[in-house]
Amino acid sequence: MVTLTASYEELTESSAVALAIRLGLIQESSHLTCTEIGDGNLNYVFHIFDHKQEKGLIIKQALPYAKVVGESWPLTLDRARIESAALIKQSEYTPHLVPAVYYSDTALAVTAMEDLSHLEIVRKGLIAGKQYPHLSDHVGEFLGKTLFYTSDFATNPKIKKQFVKQFTNPDLCDITEKLVFTDPFFDSSTNDFEEELREAAEALWADLEVQAKAAELKRIFLTSAETLVHGDLHTGSIFASETETKIIDPEFAFYGPFGFDIGHFIANLFLNALSRENEHDQQHLFDHVVNVWATFKEVFAKAWKEDSIEAFSVSDSFLETTFDRILKEATGFAGCELVRRTIGLAHAADLDAIPSPSKRIQQKKTALTLGKTFIKQYHAVETASDLVALFQQSVKE
């Protein structure tokens, strides 16, 4: 349900509860609690819970600025509309893998959705040493279905162009264009890294091959409106348990390249692998890298054979060349994400949480090496196992 209110105002814990009661999403009770639990950079997230009914609710509100910077970095509130619309679209294909949306309000920039507090954020769980045996199965299914069915392969071209317009997301794409594809490759003011990494960062900035390949990847990101991508699919955007997975926070959603989400997810698996002590502890992450690609291919190929409206989909070689291109581009995007999460704005906690300062710096240098390798060699990658081999090679350098 979408309802327009008169004007925007930042919610508080008490006004979030009042809104939920007014909408009939939760009953007024002395047993209600509300806590602002948002740990991201762009939003408030209110967890409302009725302890008598044992029923919860999430109300998420977009802020008109980035919390990580402050009011000097204004942001559009339209991203709340994008997020709720993306969740609803994704739920058409994978309802079991995204939170249910109960209500959205474009003026308040609010989305009310399913409470997932019985699950945990995957990044936090991985840092704590937990394993999620079905993570790559579920993420691979999510990617295979959502990326296929929102593309030209399954959507009438005229309707797809309407979706491209609906999900045009210039402000948040601008963040990605700058923070992932531009600033980390130059001595930019937004970059954030330890002084011990300066030499490695300067070597990256001076590497002309890296610059040329990063420019290629940025161009692909800017110009390839292939499918509805999540836009920020890292391990901090996934809730999970041993049996269940939910992908959240698609406020960066837009029509972009097939490989973008895949590359982001894989990069963040490798970031966690770098925080592990040895290859034995890393192996289940390597398995997820290989399996998420295998599952994506299996799900995508099944949809291709059953539901493609593209005349040329009768060609098996067209499918294989499509997969080959997606994996190559995903590898390059993973490389850019590795660089960004190491020396750019908004690090990955996986590396920042390494207790030993010397070990932390060493693993960040390895992350930069791996990122450069992926960027330079993305055209040569043929299998997901190649990515694991490149990781192992970078660790030894």
Swiss-Prot record:
Its EC number is 2.7.1.100. It catalyses: 5-(methylsulfanyl)-D-ribose + ATP = 5-(methylsulfanyl)-alpha-D-ribose 1-phosphate + ADP + H(+). It is an enzyme of class 2 (transferase). InterPro entries: Aminoglycoside_PTrfase, Kinase-like_dom_sf, Methylthioribose_kinase. One of its GO terms (molecular function) is S-methyl-5-thioribose kinase activity. GO terms for biological process: L-methionine salvage from methylthioadenosine. Substrate binds at D232, R340. Disulfide bonds: none annotated. It holds the Pfam family APH. ATP binds at N43, K60, E114, D115, L116, D249, P250, E251. Pathway: Amino-acid biosynthesis; L-methionine biosynthesis via salvage pathway; S-methyl-5-thio-alpha-D-ribose 1-phosphate from S-methyl-5'-thioadenosine (hydrolase route): step 2/2. The keyword Coiled coil does not apply. Homodimer. Belongs to the methylthioribose kinase family. Catalyzes the phosphorylation of methylthioribose into methylthioribose-1-phosphate. This is Methylthioribose kinase. It comes from Bacillus pumilus (strain SAFR-032).
